[in-house]
């Protein structure tokens, strides 16, 4: 009897150790040692796409083994770049769908795009092309992209310093469209170099900007360019709230929230901030607001854009473009 019990226990142990699933963990031998080859070339699902109307495009390709891949889409006019990465033996809609957004500024234009598929461990480069008929449209309230110049409803102040240049310029460096606002100069007696006031009345005479009343849903976005060798610029945005609705901002009794941006990078960069995260600043230091202390995003009457620099730091320069409020999330250009 003891013999049979021992034998039964041994059989039970053997069966319990048997691997029920024949699937092999980790990469297959084909993926490890097999020769890489392209089974189906890179292709776009459509050869031209209208992102403005909601169209999308995706890319397909098939290779002989699982590989790390990088898909790069480059605008041949704008220089905009969108990248996607993955690890698989196939490129398909679920991994390569494109809605017209960019990974690196600038924003894509109406243009032809070159699509390149490369692999981490293979020399192959697959190429295709797709045409953007209409570029992606970003929803939100646009303060300015400067394509129509300087709005007559705005006001400005520019110090009488040296090499002052506050104006709308047009050149290929613009991250969106063809124009941007240039702010540059040397002021050796004051932090302020110049400013622009964006007034709500410049947009159809409205007493306040038409924004969601929930400050957690409102995002302020701006693209800022930092000049090489002049990383001393500070851009300060101030948001004046007309809390009592009398048509006037009263600094002593109403809130003004702010966002200070030290431009210490080179090139274009998108800055996004949720309105409820803004604070009141006094000489760059957070302080209690003077009004009700509530972020009334639907009561913003004026947005002030100041260009600042330490007066001992010399010439300062920044470029700004595509100032826009978005809802429920930051701008995805």
Locate the predicted segments by residue.
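C-terminal motif of bacterial Sec signal peptides marking the signal peptidase cleavage site
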Residues: 13-16
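Extracellular ligand-binding interfaces
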Residues: 137-138, 201, 206, 213-288, ...
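Extracellular beta-strand ligand-recognition surfaces/modules
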Residues: 112-119, 222, 272-317, 323
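Extracellular polysaccharide-targeting segments
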Residues: 23-28, 136, 142, 307-333
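Beta-strand-rich interaction surfaces with strong enrichment in secreted/lumenal proteins
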Residues: 84-88, 103-105, 205-212, 257-264, ...
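Acidic/polar, low-complexity intrinsically disordered N-terminal segments immediately downstream
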Residues: 18-97, 101-112, 120-155, 333
């Amino acid at each position: 009897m003891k013999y049979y019990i021992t034998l039964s226990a041994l059989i039970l142990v053997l069966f319990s150790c048997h691997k029920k699933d024949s699937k092999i963990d980790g990469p297959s031998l084909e993926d490890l040692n097999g020769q890489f080859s392209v089974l189906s070339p890179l292709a776009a699902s459509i050869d031209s796409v209208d992102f403005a109307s909601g169209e999308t495009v995706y890319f397909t390709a098939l290779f002989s083994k699982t590989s790390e891949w990088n898909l790069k889409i480059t605008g041949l006019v704008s220089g905009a770049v969108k990248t996607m990465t993955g690890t698989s033996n196939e490129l398909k809609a679920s991994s390569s769908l494109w809605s017209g957004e960019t990974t690196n500024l600038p924003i894509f234009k109406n243009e032809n795009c070159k699509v390149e598929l490369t692999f981490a461990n293979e020399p192959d480069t697959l190429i295709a092309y797709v045409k953007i008929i209409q570029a992606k449209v970003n929803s939100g309230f646009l303060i300015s992209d400067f394509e129509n110049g300087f709005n007559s409803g705005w006001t400005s102040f520019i110090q009488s310093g040296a090499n002052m240049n506050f104006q709308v310029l047009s050149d290929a460096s613009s991250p969106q469209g063809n124009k941007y606002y240039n702010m540059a100069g040397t002021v050796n007696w004051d932090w302020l170099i110049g400013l622009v006031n964006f007034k709500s009345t410049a947009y159809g005479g409205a007493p306040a900007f038409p924004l969601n009343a929930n400050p957690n849903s409102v995002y302020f976005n701006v693209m800022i360019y930092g000049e090489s060798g002049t990383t001393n610029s500070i851009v300060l945005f101030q948001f004046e709230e007309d809390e009592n609705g009398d048509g006037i901002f009263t600094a002593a009794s109403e809130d003004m929230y702010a966002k200070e941006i030290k431009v210490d990078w080179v090139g274009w960069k998108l800055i996004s901030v949720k309105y409820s995260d803004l604070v009141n600043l006094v000489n760059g230091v957070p302080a209690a607001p003077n009004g009700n202390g509530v972020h009334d995003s639907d009561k913003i009457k004026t947005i002030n854009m100041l260009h600042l620099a330490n007066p001992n730091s010399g010439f300062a320069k920044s470029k700004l473009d595509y100032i826009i409020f978005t809802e429920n999330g930051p701008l995805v250009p």
